[in-house]
Design a protein with these regions (language model features):
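PRPP-associated nucleotide enzymes
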Residues: 1-235
Length: 235
C-alpha cells in the first residue's frame, strides 16, 4: 500500500506540473518547496517535470499533529507556528512554489505563505495536489463545516487572495482520479464527495448537514474551549 501511495503522489506531482506548463509556459518558478511531510513526493515529481530545484524549506516539529482537524481556530493558528520553522536561505530573493497535499480551511497555507514572505521570498505561489475541498466529509474524518472550508463559495482567484498567494493552482479532479486509477484495473470508482458534493449514501440531506455543521463549527468549539478555561480559572 505504501508503494502504491508513493506512485500515486508522484503522478499527482507530474499532473500538476503539466497543468502549470499549460497555464504558465513561461513561469518564473525558481524552486519547489513542499509542506512537510505529505506533499514531499508530489513536490519532487513536480520540480523534476518543471526542471527547477526542489528544496526542503521548512523544518518540522514532529510532536504537532494535523492542524486541519484540530478543534478551534485559535489552536490551529498557534499550532502552525509551533509545527514549522522556515529555512531563510531557501527563500531569500526567490520565486517559490509551495506544494501541499490539499487545502482545507486555509489556516495552514495562509500562515506558511506569510512565513515564506517573512523569510525573503520574492513571490509565493501555492499548489494543491488535490482539487478544491468544497464540501464537508461525513464518513468519519472530523473536517470542518462547509462554511469553514476556504474553497466553499469562492473562485480560485478569491481563494488565492484570501490565503495571500501570488498565484494558486489546484489539481484537476479528473487528473486525481487517473493518478489513483492508473495501473489498478480493480478500481472503478471513487468517493469524491468533499470535492463534488455527491455523497454515496442517500441519507445525506440538508438537515443532516445542518446538524453536522452545528456540532462541528469553530464557534461552538471555541466557546467550549473558553468555558473550560473559565471553569479552570475559577477552580
Amino acid at each position: 500500500m505504501g508503494s502504491e501511495m508513493c506512485i500515486r503522489d508522484r503522478r499527482q506531482g507530474e499532473r500538476l506540473a503539466h497543468k502549470i506548463m499549460r497555464e504558465r509556459p513561461d513561469h518564473d518558478i525558481d524552486v519547489v518547496i513542499p509542506i512537510p511531510d505529505t506533499s514531499r513526493v508530489a513536490g519532487q515529481a513536480l520540480a523534476h517535470e518543471l526542471g527547477v530545484k526542489f528544496r526542503e524549506g521548512f523544518m518540522k516539529n514532529r510532536y504537532i499533529g494535523r492542524t486541519f482537524i484540530m478543534p478551534g481556530q485559535t489552536q490551529r493558528r498557534k499550532s502552525v507556528r509551533q509545527k514549522l520553522n522556515p529555512v531563510p536561505l531557501e527563500f531569500e530573493g526567490k520565486t517559490v512554489l509551495l506544494v501541499d497535499d490539499s487545502i482545507v480551511r486555509g489556516t495552514t497555507c495562509q500562515q506558511i505563505i506569510q512565513m515564506a514572505r517573512d523569510s525573503g521570498a520574492k513571490r509565493v505561489y501555492f499548489a494543491s495536489a488535490a482539487p478544491p475541498v468544497r464540501y464537508p466529509n461525513v464518513y468519519g474524518i472530523d473536517m470542518p463545516t462547509a462554511s469553514e472550508l476556504v474553497a466553499h463559495g469562492r473562485t480560485i482567484e478569491q481563494i488565492s487572495e484570501h490565503i495571500g498567494a501570488d498565484w494558486l493552482i489546484y489539481q484537476e479532479i479528473d487528473d486525481l482520479i487517473e493518478c489513483s486509477r492508473e495501473g489498478n484495473s480493480l478500481v472503478d470508482g471513487f468517493e469524491l464527495s468533499v470535492f463534488d458534493g455527491q455523497y454515496q449514501t442517500g441519507v445525506i440531506d440538508d438537515a443532516y448537514l445542518t446538524g453536522l455543521s452545528d456540532a462541528r463549527s469553530d464557534n461552538s468549539v471555541d466557546r467550549a474551549d473558553g468555558a473550560l478555561v473559565g471553569l479552570h480559572n475559577r477552580s
